[in-house]
A protein has these predicted regions:
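Active-site-adjacent structural elements that line small-molecule/cofactor binding pockets in enzymes
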Residues: 1-325
Length: 325
């Protein structure tokens, strides 16, 4: 008992659910819709992205989101924020105080689960419980080949790595075995602030809805028309209810090209719309009505400077869907 009391707090296990953490509480609640932002800019300027994140925090955005893209794959041409997501979010954590910091998503099938357990718990601690870890199974063949992994087994690897990850967060000096490793007489530290880091499935992760509602804390999916998205949300809610797991939020990614004319009608684009702020407000209210809890907005593909579009959202849109704390 004395040894446990003398142990540094960051090495102690917690019984608190991840849903009590500040990042979660700011972003998710039943019946509520909040907004998130991808602060990535076309020029990749880090200081500019820090300024955008700070502006988003001040405006009342609930979260900022980044991606895990290990390699610059020639046939894809998208490198996200370029920096490793954990380094990137740690930098943003040091420059902010309340906004949630999320990944959408870490490629769990490629990650070593013990290293991921340490990095995610560390970011959780350094950010004061603001980290939200979206995870996915990955889809770029070049990355799997480069890391010596079989793309064909990424669904199974996802499940196994998620299991090891949770055991590493929640155990002390207890053996953990899996197909690619064994840990005995050792443990991963630091431990998370709560019993684990909030984990969100991004996409299907090549799993059933039942698996994801049982083993993750929520779901981030892709933009769909309102009818199709309601079908998906209702299916998710039904699975959560059947399994008795309580509230599991659903979020959506949305690319927007915000027109300067506030009354510009919505025009469909890849993964989103070109539209004015009034059409955007109408869309967001409809998304809230169908059961979505969070919308991750990307402005990087718009025609206006990101700062200008963000300022308009901050003045006219975010106040109707503010962060929850």
């Amino acid at each position: 008992m004395g040894a446990a009391r003398d142990m540094p707090e960051i090495m102690r296990l917690s019984d608190e659910p991840p849903t009590t953490l500040p990042g979660w509480q700011r972003t998710f609640a039943p019946g509520e819709l909040t907004l998130g932002l991808s602060p990535v800019t076309p020029d990749g300027d880090l200081e500019r992205q820090v300024a955008l994140t700070q502006a988003a925090e001040d405006a009342g955005f609930a979260a900022v989101w980044c991606r895990d893209i290990p390699l610059n794959v020639e046939t894809f041409g998208d490198v996200g924020q370029i920096h490793d997501p954990f380094m990137y979010l740690t930098w943003l954590a040091a420059k902010t105080s309340t906004i949630a910091l999320g990944t959408a998503a870490v490629v769990l099938s490629l990650a070593h689960p013990l290293l991921l357990a340490k990095r995610s718990a560390g970011l959780d601690r350094l950010s004061g419980g603001r980290f939200l870890m979206g995870v996915a199974s990955g889809d770029r063949p070049e990355e799997f080949a480069a890391f010596g992994m079989d793309k064909g087994t990424r669904g199974e690897d996802f499940r196994e790595n998620l299991s090891v990850l949770r055991k590493a967060w929640a155990s002390r000096m207890r053996p953990v075995k899996w197909s690619r490793g064994r840990m005995g007489g050792a443990e991963v530290v630091p431990k998370p602030t709560a019993a684990g880091v909030p984990v969100l499935a991004v996409g299907s992760c090549l799993q059933t809805t039942e698996f994801n509602t049982a083993h993750t804390d929520g779901w981030l999916t892709y933009h769909r028309n309102l009818h199709d998205q309601k079908v998906m949300v209702d299916r998710w809610r039904a699975s959560s209810e059947e399994q008795g797991v309580g509230f599991r939020p659903v979020g959506e990614s949305l690319w927007i090209d915000l027109a300067e004319d506030p009354d510009y009608p919505a025009e469909g684009r890849d993964f989103g719309f070109r539209l004015g702020r009034n059409a955007l407000l109408e869309l967001l209210h409809s998304q809230q009505d169908l059961g979505l809890n969070h919308i991750m907005i990307s402005l990087r593909h718009g025609n206006r400077p990101v700062e200008d579009a963000l300022a308009e959202l901050a003045e006219y849109v975010v106040p109707e869907f503010p962060a929850l704390r």
